[in-house]
Amino acid sequence: MFKSITFMSAILMATSAFAVDSPITGNVSSKCSIFTDKAGVYGNPSPDELSTLAADGGVLPIIRYDVSIADYYTAKISWPNSFSSSPTLTDSIAWDGEVSVSSTSDAGMAGYEAAKVEYDNHTEYDLTVAGSTWFTVESEAVYGQDKSLPGGEYVANIVAECIAD
């Protein structure tokens, strides 16, 4: 009897199965990168207005998109519609803005501006050609009903996204 128990134990140990989890990993690096090539600056052309236009004393920000694979990404750029920091404001701000293609690295990108889609404070471009595209972003903020803006620093942010198609 003892021999048969030992024999059965040896057989069971020889036929035991062991499970192993073996992971498969991978890293994906984006083929679309976004850079601020020039930081924007608000000019103050009148007591109730801030503007990035050069004629108003401002500096237009320039955002660059670098795409290494065509037809896989959409650029979504949103001009500001609020201040991320400012002095205390007691009235509303009327926001306006515009996003435009200012330069491209490839002649095949010439149609980007005509094909852009605009809604609310957002502008989208289908990035159909690999290379670099530079966008300028106009921003204007008008305070209240003929009220002067309080003195201090005003900061507003452009949101630039690369959306995978």
Please name every model-derived segment:
Residues 1-19:
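Gram-negative bacterial Sec-dependent N-terminal signal peptides
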Residues 91-105:
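Short, surface-exposed beta-strand/strand-loop-strand elements in extracellular ectodomains
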